[in-house]
């Protein structure tokens, strides 16, 4: 069942972790985890790298450009994978979208 608050991820999206979730390195297990009320998710290394870019400021397009340059990889392939991963996390309630910036 979905909450109705999920986002539809596109290259224009500016995803971030919601207030109730934190990306944290678990020293005991030596893995990165997303901590949310009554839930823990252990993303893989690639997901962690993408999640660390999800600051609500960068757009998905900016993240894809950065990753494509870093890994000298095909931008369209990275975009497809990043959007699919972020959409999956959003559908599970681990991501939200930044609202318009207030200065």
Regions found by a protein language model. Give the residues of each.
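Acidic, low-complexity/disordered tracts enriched in E/D and polar residues
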Residues: 1-48, 52, 103
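Long, charge-rich, low-complexity alpha-helical segments
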Residues: 36-103
């Amino acid at each position: 069942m979905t909450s109705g608050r999920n986002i539809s991820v596109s290259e224009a999206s500016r995803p971030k972790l919601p207030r109730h979730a934190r990306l944290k390195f678990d020293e005991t297990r030596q893995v990165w985890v997303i901590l949310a009320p009554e839930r823990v998710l252990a993303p893989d290394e690639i997901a962690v790298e993408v999640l660390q870019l999800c600051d609500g400021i960068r757009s998905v397009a900016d993240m894809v450009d950065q990753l494509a340059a870093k890994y000298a990889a095909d931008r369209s392939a990275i975009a497809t994978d990043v959007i699919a991963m972020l959409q999956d996390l959003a559908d599970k309630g681990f991501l939200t979208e930044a609202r318009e910036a207030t200065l």
